[in-house]
Amino acid sequence: MKKLIYYFGSNGSDGNASMKNILGNKGAGLAEMSNLKLPIPDGFTITTELCNYFYTHNNNFPKNFQSDLKKAITELEIITGKIFGSTSNPLLLSVRSGSKVSMPGMMDTILNLGMNNEVCNALADSCGDKRFALDSYKRFLEMYGSTVLSIPSDLFEQICEKHKMQADIHKDSDITVELLEKIIDDFKRLHIKYTKQLINDPYEQLESAIKAVLHSWMSNRAVIYRKINNISEDCGTAINIQAMVFGNLGKTSATGVAFTRSPSTGEKKLFGEFLINAQGEDIVSGTRTPMPIIANDSNSMQAMMPEVFKELSQIAQKLEEHYLDMQDIEFTIENNKLYILQTRTAKRTAIAAINIAVQMVEEKLISKEQALMRIDPESLNQLLHTRIDYSKGLTSIAEGLPASPGAATGIAVFSPYDAEKLSHHHKVILVRHDTSPEDINGMHVSSGIVTIRGGMTSHAAVVARGMGKPCVCGTSNLSIDEKKQILTAGDIVIKQGDIITIDGGSGKIFLGEMPLIQPTFSEESKLILDWADEISSLKVRANAETVNDALVSVKFGAQGIGLCRSEHMFFDKNKIPLVRDMIIAPDIERRKLAVQKLLPLQTEDFKALFRVMKDKPVNIRLLDPPLHEFLPTTEEDKKNLANSLNLPLSMINQRLHAMHEVNPMLGHRGCRLGICSPEIYQMQIEAIFTAIFELHKKEHIECNLELMIPLISNVGEIQKLKMDIYAVIEKLEQRYRYKFSFTLGTMIELPRAALGSKKIAKEVDYFSFGTNDLTQTTYGISRDDIASFLPYYLEEKIFESDPFTTLDEEGVGELIDIAIKRGKSSNANLKLGACGEHAGNPASIEFFHRMNLNYVSCSPYRIPIARIAAAQAKIKHG
């Protein structure tokens, strides 16, 4: 068996920062801080190997683990000068989880372990503070009971509230020694009620606590968190056991969390919160509203503990310069002595991540490449957050702490269950006293989060920032009744289902729906995206067919349009009647008449698009979907169509019935329409090239056209359509006395097209991989129907991910690889692109880079994500 226990502390460390795989993120940080000679409580880390062994050996420990554990405790006793379980000089322990990847609040922690009646008395004697000893015992019974013994945590809270009410006490800090003794007695009875015994033996407490932490790795909340954040279940958790240091020893003791820069904005100054006379869980759980580390008032640490503040500032700077990244630091102050409990790379908003990355490049701490690798591409969604338009003179009903930026409107809900249930039909704002890891699903589906208690580093704040959701915490002027499902702000009563708006940037809450403003990119955002474009070899284009889409695309840095779905233009209310006339027309003459009416409208559509894009490439796909998608479905629309065509309704119904297809997505669509109904493609070709000529002649705009044929499966299809297309273009060149320049390409979206790409490539200038249909036809799964079984497939690990979100490299990717190799073998100059949903997915973009594609094309709002992902792929793979 490999080494399972690594020491750290005042005598140095067995490990270092590079050992996250076995020591976990927290353990590696503690080891590294030991090596940096920082003040940390002595302790040891039990490696992730134990977790993996535990789950593969029927929840048992390895043979010699218990004896190794006792040796480690003995070593800790020698270093600290205290004895575990002693009735004269007791050593108390903290037991904390720590996986390779940080999972804030998802795993279990036990403090003050080793407590019993005798130890409590000894602790009181040694420190001369009975209230502190009893408070520590109370905390242990509550944490051990809820975490290890699975006693519902609200039962402990109910006992406390009952005693406080009877004694007419409102603050925990006012609880007397006598009241603490009564609460402890009731806590003990609760333990005995649930487990038939009170576990007093310190080693039995320790072993059961270790098992509880290991079990928490597979807890429902941790599994959900890992799924949401794509964290592997195989890495397991390490366990960190440390000598307790106490932040609840009185007014010269405290606990807190500090960030070396602002996690919301990236501003370069120490940011954080602390609580006097408290333990670590008080601040991260959000059950008490903390005070700031830096502020202009007398309640800040800077004002109350200036010497400790100075030391903390120096340590924070040292840690950031050592790790070359913003740090999240947990600390405890015991009788004015500072201890660092943990440091880790801090979670941050997308805005903060970009600002910090740019600052650190300017400070010459890191390179542009390192800066880009620190940006989570998906987090850039946060840059698209809306904000409230305050120019309208709005009045808020409440104000709390601005815990996570952005604005959101939705119906107020008061439980995670209701959030999940109602989110299917509404945007929801989850309102809670405070959140806990069990609320993770409800938080995930909510548009925003409000908590009555808690601060900027509470569970709600940290998780909301990680999810990119607006969050307001510490709204002490609000009161909530979760049972009655009402929220009260002064005289205003908000019931479940009432609409509220929250501003996570200012901490304000409003009744009703507020006017919102779309965000704009900061100069730092533009700069880091420019760096991405400098580095990446994969160009990023947009899927766009409207002027608005094109404008948004250009704003977000698109280098062209990679997919213009021309059929989307047909759904305009002025065009759809003509399209229906064209489809339903009983004879060729009527059809041609409808086509001619459509021609000038389509011409204007294309002109508008080319104007926005100027000389950037615009890849126009000819009509693709089956014609039934344009046809009326309601009786009223059918009657209107009959009237416009001056035909009986029965004939319309007969024609609709004749056009019905059993499987239209594999039926009469794409190039098959162009071959069987050539007048449609002919009209589109005339509209496109007329638009190009008119812009050239009248507005001096030189268009960069790429013309694409959809759903090819056979080289004969492309040869036939190519002939028809060039015949129309030749006539237009004669009419306008102008030579058109363009490239011709095809979608590769069917397996047969991929396999037959050698012949197809000879006929075209480029391939564009339509990965949506290629995935559908490779798997034999409809994208519209996969939701009925995908959750089960993911749960059973039949699929590793949704194949319509992340490209299946093994199957679909293999077809793309074949198509590229065979296509290039017959056409060395073949250009390559991808335009499905996968083209905006970072993992898929990495694959497209490895396949040496020229560009990807995604929705306008995925462009910033794709630009960063393309640069990261280049940095990783060259």
Swiss-Prot record:
Region (Central) location: 405-502
UniProt-annotated stretches for the region Linker 1: 348-404
Catalytic activity: pyruvate + phosphate + ATP = phosphoenolpyruvate + AMP + diphosphate + H(+)
Post-translational events: Phosphorylation of Thr-457 in the dark inactivates the enzyme. Dephosphorylation upon light stimulation reactivates the enzyme.
Binding sites annotated in the UniProt record for Mg(2+): E749, D773
SUPFAM superfamilies membership: Glutathione synthetase ATP-binding domain-like (SSF56059), Phosphoenolpyruvate/pyruvate domain (SSF51621), Phosphohistidine domain (SSF52009)
Active site: H459, C835
Region (Linker 2): 503-537
Enzyme Commission (EC) number: 2.7.9.1
Other remarks on this protein: The reaction takes place in three steps, each mediated by a carrier histidine residue located on the surface of the central domain. The two first partial reactions are catalyzed at an active site located on the N-terminal domain, and the third partial reaction is catalyzed at an active site located on the C-terminal domain. For catalytic turnover, the central domain swivels from the concave surface of the N-terminal domain to that of the C-terminal domain.
Function noted in UniProt: Catalyzes the reversible phosphorylation of pyruvate and phosphate.
Name this polypeptide is given: Pyruvate, phosphate dikinase
UniProt source species: Rickettsia conorii (strain ATCC VR-613 / Malish 7)
